[in-house]
Amino acid sequence: MIALLLFLVTSRTVTAQSEVVDEPEANPGRPTVSTPATLTPVGYLQFETGFTPAYDSPEFSSRYSLNEVIKLTIASRLEFLVQAEPIANFTTDGATANRPADIFLGAQGVLYHGEGATPTLAVSYFHRVYDGGAPEFDYGSPTNSFLVLASADVKGFHYDANAFLTELVQEPVRRGQFGQSLTISHPFLKRFTLSGELWHFTQPFLRGNAIGNLWAVSYTARKNLVFDTGFNHGLSGTSTRWEAFVGFTYLLPHRLWKAQ
């Protein structure tokens, strides 16, 4: 993956410079459904790379995919994002195939910078620019997505809360979808963080609800490098029964342009 190559190339340079210049700090958005309302450092590329096996879902019996999110904050209140699954291997109706999945372009804007228990508030928008045709997870693959995000720290715990309004399409029919997610995280053993999450999405074409409970552990190897692993268990009959996650978030330590 792109992030792994960049990490290997830059690691020696970063080590040599670490005594002189502090590393910028990554702001992971994976592997939870919720996205932080806060943005990545201005002028730095952040890569969120992972592998996701999943089992027993309405559209597949098994699915294995690589996933990548690239983020770039260009101002203190504006971030651009690319989200993609380069390849997905899946089994459905007894047949196994490989296919690229979807690509999304999006932007996130901060409405209010909070501090401590006062939440940071943001909104974001995503549009699917490529449909690879791979079977989707229980919450579908929206053509358009609008999110409202809030993040804050309260008594040693951090939370990320998202509300989703999306558009699902099965030609020629278009239907609205609603969702909510809440992630609560707490650090332990200095470099580790435990995250628990509950999420819900309506399923307008199935006339059901996808509900899941996700747990993840992350390890901060450096300020700009965070590893993660976890799992998600579907709680409704039309949810993906099991998903696992393993990956990392890497913030490229070189600013793309000089600070103002």
PLM regions and their residue ranges:
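Catalytic cores of secreted/periplasmic lytic hydrolases that degrade extracellular macromolecules
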Residues: L4
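C-terminal segment of classical bacterial N-terminal signal peptides
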Residues: F7-T15
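Transmembrane beta-barrel domains of Gram-negative outer membranes and organellar outer membranes
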Residues: A16-Q260
